[in-house]
Each structure stands twice: as structure tokens, then as C-alpha cells.
Amino acid sequence: RIIMAESMAGLKRTHRCTEVTAAQIGENVTVMGWVQKSRNKGGIIFTDLRDRTGIIQIIFEESDCGAESFAKAERLRSEFTIAVTGVVEKRSGAANENLKTGSIEVRAKSLRILSESEVPPFPIEENSKTREEVRLKYRYLDLRRPDLQRNILVRSRVATMVRQFLADEGFLEIETPTLIKSTPEGARDYLVPSRVHPGNFYA
């Protein structure tokens, strides 16, 4: 279940998570995505923000983001959808070699919770060991996992390349009706009433 929270009015993303690099240190950026995990260390909150490109670390301190945003940051849980505006900094301590953004972090100046989420039925992470029937039941969550997102990206790129090649060769893309036969033990036919022949249906 998703609960809509704050509005996106007047808000515009400047970068996707892994588009933020060391070249932007000192600059203000606005990033959006899902909370992968959030850790409250007492006075400072570390949040891993994830979008389809990867993960970036966000730091919340009340002295930087204000009492209101810090109070909201204390509520963050896995799969909350948030928007953060802040300043890019070199990561304090050792860099995380496992992340593309492992050498930097964003010190939050403001936070908007775009939607809240209940505890997900399985962790949204690569190589999930969750049973397939559970993943299929919550397919909209399963499609957020990095390995499936890569598959979607590859499919999109291949389809775009094929379409562009055919367009360059002078082909037209025309959406025609698809006629298929009924299959034994298949799904029930979807009946569409005919307006020209009352009482008859297309299947």
C-alpha cells in the first residue's frame, strides 16, 4: 500500500543518482528515488537513495536541513519515495568501492516525502532469494530490483535501435490488429461487443 504525501509542485530533478559525480562537489543538486535503507546514528541520518541508475548516500543533520526536514528524515523507511535537495560533498571516511557514487555524498538541505510505503514483502535487491510466486504476486516491486531493471533497459535499447534502423530505411510503423487463435487451456477470450452487429461479439 502506498500513501501519497507531499506534492512535487515546483520541484525538478537535476540529476539521477549516479549522474552525480565528484565534478559536482560544492554544487546544489536535487535527486529523487526510493529509500534503499536509512540509518539513524543519533543526530545524523544516513540514507541510501536508489533510482534506476543506482544508489547515492544522503546525509541529514538538523543544523543543515532544519528541524522539519530532519523530523521527516527520522520517519524514512525502505521504499519510501523521496526528493532531496542538497550539496554534493566528498564522502567522509573511506570511499565505498562497491558504489559508482562511493566517493561522494549529498548533504541534505531539504526533504520531501512524495509517498510512504509499508514494509515490503521482500527486500528490493539484486539476486533476491524470495520465492518466485511471491515475486510475481508483487511484480510491481520485483521490477524495481537492479537485475530486472537492467533487463528492461536492454530491451528498451534494442527496440529503439531496431525501430530507428527501420525508420532510416524508409519503413513506416503501423499499428495493425493482431489476429490469434484460441488456445486449449489458455486464458478466457476477452469479448468486445460489436456496435455494427448488435448481439455479436469480437473475441
What are these regions (language model features)?
Residues 1-4:
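Short, Lys/Arg-enriched N-terminal segments with co-localized hydrophobic residues
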